[in-house]
């Protein structure tokens, strides 16, 4: 959170009235025995920790609004893959989802076309329901990031199928400059 300047970005947006006041929770999602953000199966340890421990703890100890409409999940790199799977597969928990420079669509060690319907059931077969349950679906990537090509193609495929997705690219590689800009943009869109 320090390198990402999360507190500064959020404080400035809230003070300027550009973002709704919110609590930001950053978890260590790289749990032992899990394979991070590259498959639904590989992230079950983190999903369980997030849904069954972190969210209940926050709701018990802080003044928050409960329900999916009052929650967002976003992440960068591996966290973007986790946001893709956990955020999009659990619309009853999160209705705002952001992926910043995720390698989930390829671009590091290859990667081909993703079967969106297999990975996120209902994304293509029930697009209207998918769009209604995901108020904000946001994807971003650095313009010099090797992931930009696969990400752009994935967004084009989703849009062609009727998925409502916001896509932005920012100057930079797989590093903090585009991720800070992504958070700055995403935070202004959610909870409106």
Model regions and ranges:
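Non-catalytic cap/lid and distal C-terminal segments of serine-dependent acyl enzymes
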Residues: 1-192
């Amino acid at each position: 959170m320090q390198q990402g300047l999360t507190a500064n970005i959020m404080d400035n947006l809230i003070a300027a009235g550009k973002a709704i006041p919110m609590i930001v929770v950053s978890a260590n999602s790289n749990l032992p025995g899990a394979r991070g953000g590259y498959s639904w199966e590989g992230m079950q340890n983190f999903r369980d920790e997030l849904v069954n421990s972190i969210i209940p703890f926050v709701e018990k100890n802080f003044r928050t609004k409960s329900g999916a409409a009052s929650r967002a999940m976003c992440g960068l790199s591996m966290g973007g893959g986790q946001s893709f799977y956990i955020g999009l597969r659990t619309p009853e928990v999160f209705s705002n989802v952001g992926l910043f420079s995720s390698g989930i669509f390829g671009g590091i060690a290859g990667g081909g076309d993703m079967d969106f319907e297999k990975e996120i059931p209902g994304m293509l077969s029930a697009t209207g329901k998918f769009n209604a349950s995901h108020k904000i679906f946001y994807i971003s990537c650095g313009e010099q990031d090797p992931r930009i090509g696969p990400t752009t193609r994935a967004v084009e495929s989703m849009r062609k199928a009727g998925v409502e997705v916001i896509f932005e690219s920012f100057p930079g590689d797989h590093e903090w400059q585009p991720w800070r800009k992504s958070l700055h943009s995403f935070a202004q869109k959610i909870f409106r």
